[in-house]
C-alpha cells in the first residue's frame, strides 16, 4: 500500500516575468501559463517591440484570444523602453491601465533587444516621469560592452548602472529581473522597499556546470547565463530566508527546437509547464516550504500594489515524467526538464 501523496495548497500564483511571443508560438504556450497563474507580466520584446499603447492593447487581445475557456488569466502589459520613447505615451498607457510597468533592455543584451536603451541618460526624461507617476521599472541587469566577460555582466551592471540610477531617482520602483549572482542577491537584500527582484527556476536549480560539463545542454542556455555554484547557493538562500522583496518570475522564453539546437542557438528556457513544481522542489530542499506561497503569490502583488488572487491551487508531491517535447506547428518545443522525473506538479 502506497502512502498518500503530500498536497500543498497555495493562493493562486502570478508570474512576474514571462515571454509569450506571438502568432502560432503564442497560441501554443499561453495555456501552460493561464491554467496555473492568475496574472503575468508579459515582456514586450516582440519584433517590432511593444512601444505604444495601441500595440499593447492589440497584443493583450491576441493573448486573451489564446486563453482556453475556463482559465481565469489577466496579462499585465509592459512598455519596451527605447531612446526615442515619448514620456507622454508611457504615462497615458499607465493611467489607462494598459501598461503595468516598463522594461529596460540594454541594447543587444538578450533576444530581440536591438531596439533597447543605449544609455540611461538617453531615457532620463522617461525615467523621471515613471518616478513621478509611480510606475515600476523592470530591468534586465547586464552591461553589454564586448570587453566585459559574460559571467561578470550582472555584477558590473550593479555598480555602473543600477546604483547610480537609484541614487539619482530615489523614489523610482525597480525590479531587478532574473537575478543570477550573489552580488545581486546581496544588493537587493540590502536595498530599500523600492527595490525588488525576480528569480527563475533554472537559476535556483542549476549552475553553469550543469549546462557545460559532460556535454553542452542548449535547453539550459538562457540570459543572464547560469553562473557558478556559489551564486546559485546565494539565490537559494535568499528565497529560503523568506525575504519579501523577491518573487516568482519564470522568464519562460520559448524557442522552437531547431533554434535552440543549432550552431548558434537562442537563449531562453521554456519553463512554463514545469516552473511551479521546480520552485516547490527548491523550497523543499531548503526546508523552506513555509515561505513558498509568499514567494509565488504574495510578495509580487505587494510590491506592485495589487491585490492577491482570491483563488487557490494545489501541488501534489508524486513523481511524474515531463514530456520530451510539445508540438509546435511544423516544429517542437522542448520544455524545461524534458524527459526528467519531477517531484512536484500542479494537481489537475
Swiss-Prot record:
Give the InterPro entries listed for this entry. Amidohydro-rel, DHOdimr, Dihydroorotase_CS, Metal_Hydrolase
Recite the UniProt keywords alphabetically.
Hydrolase, Metal-binding, Pyrimidine biosynthesis, Zinc
Please list the residues that bind Zn(2+) 2: 103, 140, 178
Catalysed reaction(s) here are: (S)-dihydroorotate + H2O = N-carbamoyl-L-aspartate + H(+)
**Enzyme Commission numbers on file:** 3.5.2.3
Residues annotated as the enzyme's active site: 251
Which GO CC terms are listed, alphabetically?
A: cytosol
Which positions carry N6-carboxylysine? 103
* Gene3D superfamilies linked to this entry: Metal-dependent hydrolases
What GO molecular-function term can you cite, just one? dihydroorotase activity
Could you tell me which pathway this protein works in?
Pyrimidine metabolism; UMP biosynthesis via de novo pathway; (S)-dihydroorotate from bicarbonate: step 3/3
Q: How is the cofactor bound?
A: Binds 2 Zn(2+) ions per subunit.
Top EC class for this record = hydrolase
Q: What does this protein do?
A: Catalyzes the reversible cyclization of carbamoyl aspartate to dihydroorotate.
The UniProt entry's sequence similarity note says:
Belongs to the metallo-dependent hydrolases superfamily. DHOase family. Class II DHOase subfamily.
Q: How does it assemble?
A: Homodimer.
Name by which UniProt lists this protein? Dihydroorotase
Amino acid at each position: 500500500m502506497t502512502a498518500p501523496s503530500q498536497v500543498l495548497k497555495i493562493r493562486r500564483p502570478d508570474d512576474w516575468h514571462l515571454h509569450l511571443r506571438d502568432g502560432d508560438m503564442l497560441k501554443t504556450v499561453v495555456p501552460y501559463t493561464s491554467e496555473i497563474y492568475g496574472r503575468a507580466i508579459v515582456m514586450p520584446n516582440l519584433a517590432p517591440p511593444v512601444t505604444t499603447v495601441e500595440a499593447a492593447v492589440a497584443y493583450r487581445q491576441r493573448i486573451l484570444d489564446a486563453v482556453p475557456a475556463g482559465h481565469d488569466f489577466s496579462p499585465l502589459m509592459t512598455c519596451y523602453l527605447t531612446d526615442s520613447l515619448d514620456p507622454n505615451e508611457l504615462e497615458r498607457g499607465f493611467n489607462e491601465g494598459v501598461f503595468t510597468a516598463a522594461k529596460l533592455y540594454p541594447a543587444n543584451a538578450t533576444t530581440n533587444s536591438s531596439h533597447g536603451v543605449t544609455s540611461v541618460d538617453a531615457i532620463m526624461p522617461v525615467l523621471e516621469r515613471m518616478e513621478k507617476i509611480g510606475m515600476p521599472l523592470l530591468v534586465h541587469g547586464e552591461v553589454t560592452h564586448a570587453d566585459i566577460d559574460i559571467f561578470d555582466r550582472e555584477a558590473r551592471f550593479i555598480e555602473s548602472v543600477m546604483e547610480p540610477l537609484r541614487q539619482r531617482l530615489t523614489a523610482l520602483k525597480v525590479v531587478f529581473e532574473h537575478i543570477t549572482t550573489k552580488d545581486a542577491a546581496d544588493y537587493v537584500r540590502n536595498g530599500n522597499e523600492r527595490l525588488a527582484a525576480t528569480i527563475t527556476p533554472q537559476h535556483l536549480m542549476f549552475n553553469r556546470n550543469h549546462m557545460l560539463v559532460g556535454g553542452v545542454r542548449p535547453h539550459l542556455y538562457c540570459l543572464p547565463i547560469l553562473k557558478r555554484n556559489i551564486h546559485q547557493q546565494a539565490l537559494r538562500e535568499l528565497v529560503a530566508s523568506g525575504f519579501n522583496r523577491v518573487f516568482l518570475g519564470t522568464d519562460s522564453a520559448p524557442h522552437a527546437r531547431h533554434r535552440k539546437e543549432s550552431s548558434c542557438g537562442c537563449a531562453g528556457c521554456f519553463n512554463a509547464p514545469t516552473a511551479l513544481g521546480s520552485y516547490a522542489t527548491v523550497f523543499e530542499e531548503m526546508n523552506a516550504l513555509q515561505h513558498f506561497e509568499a514567494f509565488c503569490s504574495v510578495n509580487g502583488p505587494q510590491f506592485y500594489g495589487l491585490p492577491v488572487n482570491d483563488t487557490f491551487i494545489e501541488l501534489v508531491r508524486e513523481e511524474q515524467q515531463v514530456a520530451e517535447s510539445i508540438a509546435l506547428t511544423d516544429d517542437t518545443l522542448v520544455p524545461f526538464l524534458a524527459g526528467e522525473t519531477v517531484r512536484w506538479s500542479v494537481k489537475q
